[in-house]
């Protein structure tokens, strides 16, 4: 193994939960970038309360920034996983996902869960990306 396949790049979004729980917003190893479960928050406070589309937009902007900080972009995303507290929000969430990924078309899963840390969060999204060449 060489340095490019073993070097870990940790990306923080500044979430107050990162040091408490011990996680990174994203991790890059070689040409793989994994973005952890991302919710619509700013400074630890929920945004887009009651609006799953607004939350999805905020989440995907956070994910795009994390990817950028890891030397990747949305065009490198190969998989997303979307978790909803109410599956009835699938279309509103899906339409925003389509705005960001319409031409990229990663594989995607959408699941209903019982809840998140904050009851104001309606959506959480994870993303995996593959960058053609290591360039960090």
List where the protein language model places each region:
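N-terminal presequence-like segments and the immediate start of the first folded domain
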Residues: 1-61, 65-78, 84-136
